[in-house]
């Protein structure tokens, strides 16, 4: 077997509306509605998708122990990190750590800042150096 790429991931959240607002207005993602009866929400950016499940009302099948606030996600941006920091400051978003150097998925250095989403998931925003 050869896995080519990640198609989507599921994020369990306590409040779909708050989550959509944060990822759309703070991180610039697009909110989409989908499903047979348009009952589902997802966040899209580039060729990526994050499906949202409300804690306690998850769609089946689901993770064995779906938990809001347990994710640690790294997003790569082409926006220079100093501009990201300025924008986060203007939007009253607390930077928990950074800027600091880490190693990205390409085994190359990235420069990162860390913030929290409404469920306290750890969100890393990075530029490849």
Swiss-Prot record:
InterPro entries: Glyas_Bleomycin-R_OHBP_Dase, Glyas_Fos-R_dOase_dom, GlyoxalaseI/FosfomycinResist, VOC. Pfam families: Glyoxalase. It comes from the Eukaryota. Residues 5-128 form the VOC domain. PROSITE patterns: VOC. Belongs to the glyoxalase I family. This is Glyoxalase domain-containing protein 5 homolog.
């Amino acid at each position: 077997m050869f896995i080519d790429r990640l198609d989507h991931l599921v994020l369990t959240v306590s409040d779909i509306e708050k989550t959509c607002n944060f990822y759309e207005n703070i991180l610039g993602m697009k909110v989409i509605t989908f499903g047979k009866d348009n009952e589902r929400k997802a966040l899209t950016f580039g060729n990526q998708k994050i499906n949202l499940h409300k804690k306690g009302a998850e769609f089946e099948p689901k993770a064995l122990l779906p938990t809001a606030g347990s994710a640690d996600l790294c997003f790569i941006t082409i926006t220079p990190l100093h501009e990201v920091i300025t924008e986060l400051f203007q939007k009253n978003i607390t930077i928990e750590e950074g800027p600091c150097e880490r190693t990205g998925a390409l085994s190359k250095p990235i420069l990162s800042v860390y913030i929290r989403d409404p469920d306290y998931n750890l969100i890393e925003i990075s530029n490849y150096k």
